């Protein structure tokens, strides 16, 4: 006797359509288009999880650079001094300090650069 796959197929297709719910137009109603849309979205999500790390690092560096240039120093010179003095503070923390407490950041920069 032949095994029919009606319920299985319906369940699988329903699953793809459920994942494509937020898609635009036919991409959320047609099974074939929904599947392609979801697969492409998954690729983008995977790629952008990697890019997110790069983007945040770039953002932190830009913020630190802007804050340091106000004190007439360069980012590269500042980072070099930090490494020389073996001060282990990451860029995320420096960036937050520059935004949240500009006065404290200013004191920190001068203490690193002048000693």
UniProtKB/Swiss-Prot annotation:
GO terms for biological process: ribosomal large subunit assembly; translation. PROSITE patterns: RIBOSOMAL_L20. The keyword Mitochondrion does not apply. One of its GO terms (cellular component) is ribonucleoprotein complex. GO terms for molecular function: rRNA binding; structural constituent of ribosome. Keywords: Ribonucleoprotein, Ribosomal protein, RNA-binding, rRNA-binding. It comes from the Bacteria. InterPro entries: Ribosomal_bL20, RIBOSOMAL_L20_CS, Ribosomal_protein_bL20_C. It holds the Pfam family Ribosomal_L20. Binds directly to 23S ribosomal RNA and is necessary for the in vitro assembly process of the 50S ribosomal subunit. It is not involved in the protein synthesizing functions of that subunit. Belongs to the bacterial ribosomal protein bL20 family. NCBIfam families: rplT_bact. This is Large ribosomal subunit protein bL20. It comes from Malacoplasma penetrans (strain HF-2) (Mycoplasma penetrans).
């Amino acid at each position: 006797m032949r095994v029919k796959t009606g319920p299985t197929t319906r369940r699988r297709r329903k699953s793809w359509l459920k994942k494509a719910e937020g898609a635009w137009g036919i991409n959320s109603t047609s099974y074939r288009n929904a599947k392609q849309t979801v697969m492409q979205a998954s690729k983008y999500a995977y790629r952008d999880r990697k890019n997110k790390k790069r983007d945040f690092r770039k953002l932190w560096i830009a913020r630190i650079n802007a804050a340091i240039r106000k004190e007439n120093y360069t980012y590269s010179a500042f980072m070099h001094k930090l490494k020389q003095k073996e001060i282990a503070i990451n860029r995320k923390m420096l960036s937050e300090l520059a935004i949240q407490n500009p006065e404290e950041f200013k004191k920190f920069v001068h203490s690193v650069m002048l000693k």
